[in-house]
Amino acid sequence: MIPPEIRRSVLLQKAIKLALAGTLLTFASFSATAADPSSDTETPQPPDILLGPLFNDVQNAKLFPDQKTFADAIPNSDPLMILADYRMQRNQSGFDLRHFVDVNFTLPKAGEKYVPPAGQSLREHIDGLWPVLTRSTKNVEKWDSLLPLPESYVVPGGRFREIYYWDSYFTMLGLAESGHWDKVADMVANFGYEIDAWGHIPNGNRTYYLSRSQPPFFAFMVELLAQHEGDDALKEYLPQLQKEYAYWMEGVETLQPGQQNQRVVKLEDGSVLNRYWDDRDTPRPESWVEDIATAKSNPNRPATEIYRDLRSAAASGWDFSSRWMDNPQQLSTIRTTTIVPVDLNALLYQLEKTLARASAAAGDRAKASQYDALANARQKAIEMHLWNNKEGWYADYDLQNNKIRDQLTAAALFPLYVNAAAKDRAVKVAAAAQAHLLQPGGLATTSVKSGQQWDAPNGWAPLQWVAAEGLQNYGQDDVAMEVTWRFLTNVQHTYDREKKLVEKYDVSSTGTGGGGGEYPLQDGFGWTNGVTLKMLDLICPQEKPCDSVPSTRPASLSATPTKTPSAATQ
């Protein structure tokens, strides 16, 4: 008799093969114009490869406060010629590296500081920011690290001068709330273009981001557009949804239990789940010096291993967090690739459900059933392997130690967000989040103070939205509204004082931007703008919408939870 776990594995394997059948990844070519992605030219190389020792020397010389500056610089002529000139000149007496860079490169311009009109409400400020944050890059310079896109798009702001994958979904929520459905459609079209061009959506539209993706929110983007355009949007983007799924599942057909390949893992019982992965194992061009220093701080590990784990953490969007580290105080203990993240697998469950819905809309019932079967298999795997029964919350799985991890993070809310959680478990997650993560200014990312930006005391807009939506999905409205009210109060207090919205917030109090990480606090800020607009509509009745957060808590909101949230722990 065949053991049940082997039988499940065989059936799952057949379902995956059927679902992926006929889905071809076309890694189309780059050109300086966002043209037909089926044209055949070479994939562009990132600046650390194009410029070799020159890139390394400039970054190590720390000519610019931000390592991203030179990664975004545009060569004024063929990089091979610039590199040849550099090799000829660098050992000459009086050689000035900064002068050489200034002559041979066009540096990115500092963004003009936006000064909003006086007296604007929060909503008016955000609506006024959309055109300020909008970019159009149909054509780029020949050796630019920027990748062209066919339609205009909204950037996060600050040092982030390009489009970012998972940021954009939360930005699009705000665009839709402001009535800019044309911009939503343009951004979905851009991501569809990237999938056709590169086989996946890169971290951002830069050559140095092509080796990884980010949390897969494309299905949510298409579902959002479908709210406005109906099932036509699902049918239009079904091919791109299939290609993205093929990217995440690449290599699964040949995996044996206990094996991993790039982004996909097969556990010993045959369950198929996913992890974050970057195809390269070198320092990130945009954080070159920092990555080299991190690798040098732990000589007991191969530098390439650390580099890939740093890059893979960037793919997760949580760069960086104690979630990925053995020692929260030592970044070089990061091991992202040995961790199966609960949020990633919840998002891929949503992708499988969206594929089923889109296939049904296109009239392919057989394919819809296959994707539904894959979603059901993933849901069972999440419940079996990504639930910490001892602690009472969803968590990540540790491949290295073959066990569930104990740490509670805001990622525990993702199964609720995609409606993949068992009801009794959702109640336990709500209680845990309220007891351990809820702070005066919103939901903390974790309860650990590591100095990393995706840890306490920071709270991030996308995680507030995921939590609020997920909790409401399971009737946990009191906690959902508490997260919403506290975070909005934080945003409003910061705006009242500084007249801006920022990338992240310190949720241990209200009115303070977050800290930690590799770069100063950024303002703008795309996903905060989007989530703020959506949350304003949660706290104010439709018949009387509010343009700012009320000074007193609306009576329509539930009372404050009786349990006082605990302070973040060291």
Swiss-Prot record:
Keywords: Glycosidase, Hydrolase, Periplasm, Signal. SUPFAM superfamilies: Six-hairpin glycosidases. It comes from the Bacteria. GO terms for biological process: cellular hyperosmotic response; trehalose catabolic process. Residues 1-34 form the signal peptide. GO terms for cellular component: periplasmic space. It is an enzyme of class 3 (hydrolase). Residues 554-570 have a biased composition (Low complexity). Residues 544-570 are annotated as: Disordered. It is found in: Periplasm. It catalyses: alpha,alpha-trehalose + H2O = alpha-D-glucose + beta-D-glucose. Substrate binds at residues 159, 166-167, 203, 212-214, 284-286, 317, 518. InterPro entries: 6-hairpin_glycosidase_sf (IPR008928), 6hp_glycosidase-like_sf (IPR012341), Glyco_hydro_37 (IPR001661), Glyco_hydro_37_CS (IPR018232), Trehalase_periplasmic (IPR023720). Belongs to the glycosyl hydrolase 37 family. Provides the cells with the ability to utilize trehalose at high osmolarity by splitting it into glucose molecules that can subsequently be taken up by the phosphotransferase-mediated uptake system. This is Periplasmic trehalase. The gene is treA.
